């Protein structure tokens, strides 16, 4: 197989090709949270170096989200036709197994496209989710801090994301929000109106993913579990159906939980 790396985080396009097989010079890992799998890096200089550049410049955080697609080439060309660069390509026997697309213009988040999950991958996911230490949380999506909510809204609309809500003020969280979706994943654009729980993320990284969002069966019981681990809720909604949890110690990412209706 081959890995072709087209861009750094900034600057002019580049092209470096690496032949895969045998020992590799990077490490990653997986963290299973409910039905959401988080890939844990960093990579060192080599085929995934743009991810290390992100860590070097902005610290820990989430820099891309991966989607399975039935036609990776067609969907890649869709984004390229909209002016989004191809950052990184992985192929095996000439067949693409992953493409990274530069969709960072507003929100600093890339999209990774992968082929449809095969029988082995689906079995692997079910095995991960069945582990006794894995919660039954349902992944909803990501909260993304932006500097200009209107511009970010226009950008996500131009990329073909479905607009789920209009812009609205959230006084309890001191932000304005607007929700989009791609497939079954929610992308909540967040603009800080005054000092908020997102200030740390904005100060360290600027725009970018600030939280991952889950639906849970019983919010109160989940908050008690966090309390026993010494982890506090930063904000709980007045109706006790939503809470943001301070899980920023590693990765500087909050967890927001909604109680299932």
Over which residues does each language-model region extend?
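Conserved active-site tyrosine of GNAT-family acetyltransferases
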Residues: 1, 79, 152-157, 226
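C-terminal "cap" of GNAT-fold acetyltransferases
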Residues: 9, 13-27, 171-185
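Short Pro/Gly-enriched beta-strand edge/turn motifs at strand-loop
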Residues: 9-18, 81-84, 158-164, 227
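Short, structured active-site "lid" loops
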Residues: 19-36, 191
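Vicinal oxygen chelate
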Residues: 39, 73-135, 178-182, 186-188, ...
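Long, charged/polar, surface-exposed segments that mediate recognition or autoinhibition
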Residues: 46, 50-66, 213, 220
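Short glycine/proline-centered loop/turn elements that form peptide/ligand docking sites
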Residues: 150-152, 168-174
């Amino acid at each position: 197989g081959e890995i072709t790396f087209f861009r750094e985080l900034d600057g002019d396009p580049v092209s470096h090709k690496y032949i895969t097989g045998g020992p590799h010079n990077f490490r990653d890992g997986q963290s299973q949270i409910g039905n959401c799998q988080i890939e844990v890096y960093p990579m060192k200089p080599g085929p995934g170096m743009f991810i290390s550049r992100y860590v070097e410049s902005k610290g820990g955080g989430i820099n891309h989200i991966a989607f399975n697609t039935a036609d990776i080439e067609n969907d890649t060309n869709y984004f390229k036709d909209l002016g989004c660069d191809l950052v990184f390509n992985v192929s095996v026997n000439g067949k693409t197994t992953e493409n990274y697309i530069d969709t960072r213009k507003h929100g600093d988040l890339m999209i990774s496209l992968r082929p449809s999950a095969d029988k082995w991958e689906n079995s692997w996911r079910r095995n991960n989710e069945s582990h006794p230490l894995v919660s039954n949380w349902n992944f909803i999506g990501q909260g993304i801090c932006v500097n200009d909510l209107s511009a970010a809204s226009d950008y996500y609309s131009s990329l073909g994301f479905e607009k789920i809500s209009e812009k609205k003020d959230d006084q309890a969280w001191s932000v304005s929000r607007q929700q989009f979706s791609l497939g079954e994943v929610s992308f909540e654009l967040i603009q800080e109106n005054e000092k908020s729980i997102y200030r740390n993320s904005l100060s360290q990284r600027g725009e970018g993913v600030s939280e991952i969002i889950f639906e849970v069966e019983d919010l109160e019981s989940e908050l008690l579990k966090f309390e026993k681990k010494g982890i506090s809720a930063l904000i709980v909604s007045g109706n006790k159906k939503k809470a943001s949890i301070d899980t920023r110690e590693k990765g500087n990412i909050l967890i927001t939980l909604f109680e299932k209706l």
